């Protein structure tokens, strides 16, 4: 109920983003949504659960827009196949390392996979989608950045005590300011 948006909500978010010079994007989970929401988006996001969704990959690829693809639980050959079906220039695709545990323990973040992705996909942008609970030093994010993650995705909340499945492991304003100063 609290995390479902309708078209009018996306339109409102898109307008707010444009007004504030923020690039608007969202994850889409079916081909119909690509048709409906593409006019609002300059970037597509493909969730880890859709890395093998060939119709969705092809549909998004035909839009010729920048695309971010999460790779949680994926093998290298699955990532290669996803890129083949997207059929986009490498610089238009960011491959995001992530772990599908919510929250992820710092020791389970497998940050070495950022280097593996950089080695196997040298022409793509490599990023990191983080699901760890922010610690005082934001060490996981700092290491990911130092390893070369060009895009860092972190859930954000204005109140970590809100109900829902993301708020407690999300970044808040203080975490964001601290991370900005770290890098």
Tell what function each PLM region has:
Residues 1-183:
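Catalytic cores and adjacent flexible loops of soluble metabolic enzymes
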């Amino acid at each position: 109920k609290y995390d479902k948006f309708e078209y009018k909500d996306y339109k409102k978010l898109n307008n707010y983003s444009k007004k504030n010079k923020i690039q608007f994007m969202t994850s889409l989970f079916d081909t119909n949504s690509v048709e409906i929401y593409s006019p609002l988006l300059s970037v597509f996001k493909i969730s880890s659960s859709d890395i093998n969704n060939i119709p969705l990959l092809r549909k998004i690829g035909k839009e010729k827009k920048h695309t971010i693809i999460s790779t949680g639980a994926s093998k290298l050959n699955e990532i290669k196949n996803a890129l083949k079906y997207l059929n986009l220039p490498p610089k238009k695709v960011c491959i995001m390392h992530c772990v599908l545990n919510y929250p992820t323990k710092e020791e389970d973040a497998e940050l070495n996979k950022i280097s593996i992705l950089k080695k196997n996909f040298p022409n793509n942008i490599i990023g990191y989608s983080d699901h760890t609970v922010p610690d005082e030093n934001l060490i996981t994010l700092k290491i990911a950045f130092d390893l070369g993650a060009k895009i860092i995705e972190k859930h954000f909340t204005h109140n970590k005590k809100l109900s829902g499945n993301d708020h407690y492991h999300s970044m808040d304003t203080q975490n964001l300011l601290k991370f900005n100063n770290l890098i």
